[in-house]
């Protein structure tokens, strides 16, 4: 049994996870649940796109065997025998500005694992920190579920696919494209071992000048999210930025 947990509003990134799951000749389960516990009080829970009818149609076409759409009361009241451990990496990157996010994600994913009992679960590289947190949780609790990370799917402009991209106006979309274009220029600069903080600070300024409203973070870490001592092929660039009311994240390997 292979599980792809989603919040619905499916796009080609989600469907890549389903395709990868399908390749492994398993029972393909996709869950759709907009998890209220991972949203902060001023975040977009109420506005998050809900397109269940279309999602079901698309998943049928892509060969999902089971679509699990629990009602909120059912899943929130489900008890598991485990308590979710906490990890230092939850406090970094998205965890700094979204303190509810990882506790909420872990709580629901653990419940889904308990109900579905998957042999493997699929997560996207775009949400790299989430993938690592879930991987650490399964290892810490000794769950018999392999966590598989699937490469980020991007549109023709390089923008990583996200359900939240639908929030962007035409002008905001043009600004969002510039984030990836600038991000792609950074690895060769960083590999020269010039002053990395100077490069990142300059990039932040350029993004703000191009219309990005806020940079939540732009940083280089090792791929286990530990602080880098030196740049290597295990280093990644991570960014979170706000354009209007829309928060976008991305990461690329150096």
Regions found by a protein language model. Name each.
Residues 1-212, 245, 252:
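Nucleotidyltransferase catalytic core that binds NTPs
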């Amino acid at each position: 049994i292979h599980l792809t947990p989603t919040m619905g509003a499916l796009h080609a990134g989600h469907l890549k996870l389903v395709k990868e799951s399908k390749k492994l000749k398993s029972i393909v389960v996709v869950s759709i649940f907009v998890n209220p516990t991972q949203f902060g009080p001023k975040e977009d829970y109420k506005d998050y796109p809900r397109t269940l009818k279309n999602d079901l149609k698309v998943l049928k076409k892509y060969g999902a065997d089971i679509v699990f759409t629990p009602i909120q009361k059912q899943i929130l009241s489900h008890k598991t025998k485990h308590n979710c451990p906490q990890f230092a990496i939850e406090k970094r990157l998205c965890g700094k500005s979204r303190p509810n996010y990882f506790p909420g994600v872990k709580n629901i994913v653990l419940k889904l694992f308990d109900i579905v009992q998957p042999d493997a679960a699929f997560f996207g590289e775009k949400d790299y920190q989430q993938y690592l947190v879930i991987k650490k949780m399964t290892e810490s609790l000794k769950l018999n579920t392999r966590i598989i990370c699937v490469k980020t799917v991007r549109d023709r402009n390089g923008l990583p696919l996200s359900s939240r991209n639908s929030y962007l106006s035409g002008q905001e979309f043009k600004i969002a494209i510039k984030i990836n274009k600038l991000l792609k220029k950074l690895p060769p600069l960083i590999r020269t071992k010039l002053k990395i903080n100077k490069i990142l600070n300059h990039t932040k300024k350029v993004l703000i000048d191009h219309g990005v409203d806020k940079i939540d973070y732009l940083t280089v870490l090792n791929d286990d999210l530990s602080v880098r001592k030196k740049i290597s092929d295990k280093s990644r660039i991570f960014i979170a930025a706000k354009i209007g009311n829309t928060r976008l994240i991305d990461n690329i390997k150096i």
